[in-house]
Amino acid sequence: MQKILQTDDITDNQVLRKRKRKRTETANSENANSALEKAQRDPYSGNAFLPGESSSDEETPLMELSKEELCNKIESLKEKLRSIRKENSRLRQSLVMLQVLPQAVTQFEELVGMAETLLKSGGAVSTPASTLWRATNNSSPDSFASLCSNSNSTSSSPSSVKAEEEQHPGEKQFTIERWQIARCNKSKPQKFINDLMQVLYTNEYMATHSLTGAKSSTSRDKVVKPAMNQNEVQEIIGVTKQVFPSADDVSIRRMIGQKLNNCTKKPNASKAPNSQDGILK
């Protein structure tokens, strides 16, 4: 009787093991089929990008793995995590480059415009005074050095001085370059004119000149200031109306005068570190 009971227990244990093994195999098979179907539906999602990914890792439950196998699996997951972080860092750098690229293109266009301006002014016989005033406040110091060297080389002899005096009435047409407009604040007309005149002239020039040359009734200065070149004033008005079509000539001239008055009230502003007025003296 005891042998029969022992035989029944052994048989029951074998049946239980077979059932457990069958359930495990069925579950693993279902998981493998599910993963295969998911990969077929969306081959580019999830872990499809991870290198060395194999479905064999999921075939064995973690509970049945040895300590060494678990350690190897953890190391493998850490390596994959490091790879993902490196890829994320590379993608962030690419995104930053794409964000900075438009600004770099704009700055490159400005440099091209400055180079074209220097090439045009380099072929002139003499450098007009108004051009020197504008060059002292440009962003590139090389432009001022180039203009000064050109002026010194052409005005070293009396004949060149006479040629400059003869050429002054027929001075080259005043033009505002695109890179100069790009540097200006375009939120309001007054801010645009302030920035544009700051690019074109130095503070000392604006402090010693007026819009029309007539003495203002509200001005405290006893000395009448010389008028700005009216061709330059019209050019500034034209450019401002291109940026702000609703602005009219009267309001633009008033804004130009306001900028000149502000520079008059701040005579020491021309002694800023970025000013090169001492060179002109």
From Swiss-Prot:
This protein's GO CC annotations: nucleus
Main localization (coarse): nucleus
Ranges of compositional bias, category Basic and acidic residues: 162-172
Keywords: Coiled coil, Neurogenesis, Nucleus, Repressor, Transcription, Transcription regulation
Domain of life (superkingdom): Eukaryota
Pfam families from the UniProt entry: BEN
Span list, region Disordered: 15-62, 143-172
Function: Acts as a corepressor of recombining binding protein suppressor hairless (RBPJ) and inhibits Notch signaling in neural stem cells, thereby opposing their self-renewal and promoting neurogenesis.
GO biological process, one term: nervous system development
Compositionally biased intervals (Low complexity): 143-160
A GO MF term: transcription corepressor activity
Domain BEN: 171-271
Cell compartment(s), UniProt: Nucleus
Subunit structure: Interacts (via BEN domain) with RBPJ.
Coiled-coil ranges (or none): 19-99
InterPro entries for this protein: BEN_domain (IPR018379), BEND6-like (IPR037496)
Protein name: BEN domain-containing protein 6
